[in-house]
Amino acid sequence: MDALELKNIISDGLLSFPVTDFDQNGDFNKSSYAKRLEWLAPYGASALFAAGGTGEFFSLTGNEYSEVIKTAVDTCRGSVPIIAGAGGPTRQAIEQAKEAERLGAHGILLMPHYLTEASQEGLIEHVKQVCNSVDFGVIFYNRSVSRLNLDSIQKLTEMCPNLIGFKDSSGQIDMMTAVTQTMGDRLSYLGGLPTAEVFAAPYKALGCPVYSSAVFNFIPKTAMEFYNALRSDDFETTNRLIKDFFLPLIKIRDRKSGYAVSMIKAGAKIVGHDAGPVRPPLSDLTQADYEDLAALIATLGPQ
């Protein structure tokens, strides 16, 4: 799949990041992960991100990264495209991007570099080197210490033909308005804020109708119902789900740092698709929080 094909795929539909399965010792559970992908693939996501943030990308060793990407590509071949997470320091990101391309992934989401702040000149060089190391499509993840301004985005799109996507987790509406209005269809735009459904309508109004859904991991039917309602401007349905489900979900998520990932794994366990524990420094939900989440999920009915 070339970069333009990937751009077209991520320009429409719902995207998601499957959690990564670990056994009770915290080791990668390949068979359980494959079964998870087999369960999720038919629900209709346009693409799945393997080893993304929700997939605990930051906790995977080099060998595990390769295993996760290979398992995802092999399991979903012919059914749904796989986009691999890649990131950290420039040379590590290049190594991961090349490995993902070798294993048959259809592109990468370029995750933030680690820890250090960087100038716009440094970020441009970082993104350029990663893009130049591969032929397939690259989606830039605008978040944390890795944020590009409009001028930098314009320069990179001129230098890197395979930079085809911009995923925003900054929540800066003025910035996103400037980017979408200036860059037009040169890029595909993805909403990337936590619990993205709550922000989906305003992002759609900016020309960013696509987002990645974490809750697709445990309520895929409801996740698709929300997306389809958003797409058709069925505000009665989207507002009902935001009020009755997503806002209460955010209250649980915000009880502890790191719950944005831990809560998704807990949700998968509640619906019968246990992905095992999260790895430190994340912590699993407390029993009380787990029970609150289970009660909330139960209000949605079968998935």
Curated annotation (Swiss-Prot):
Pathway annotation from the record: Carbohydrate acid metabolism; D-glucarate degradation; 2,5-dioxopentanoate from D-glucarate: step 2/2
Entries under Gene3D superfamilies matching the protein: Aldolase class I (3.20.20.70)
Matching InterPro entries: Aldolase_TIM, DapA-like, Dehydro-deoxyglucarate_dehyd
Catalytic activity: 5-dehydro-4-deoxy-D-glucarate + H(+) = 2,5-dioxopentanoate + CO2 + H2O
Pfam families documented for this protein: DHDPS (PF00701)
Protein keywords: Lyase
Enzyme Commission identifier(s): 4.2.1.41
Coiled coil: none
GO molecular function: 4-hydroxy-tetrahydrodipicolinate synthase activity; 5-dehydro-4-deoxyglucarate dehydratase activity
Any single biological process term in GO: D-glucarate catabolic process
HAMAP family the record matches: KDGDH
Family note: Belongs to the DapA family.
Name this polypeptide is given: Probable 5-dehydro-4-deoxyglucarate dehydratase
Source organism per UniProt: Acinetobacter baumannii (strain AB307-0294)
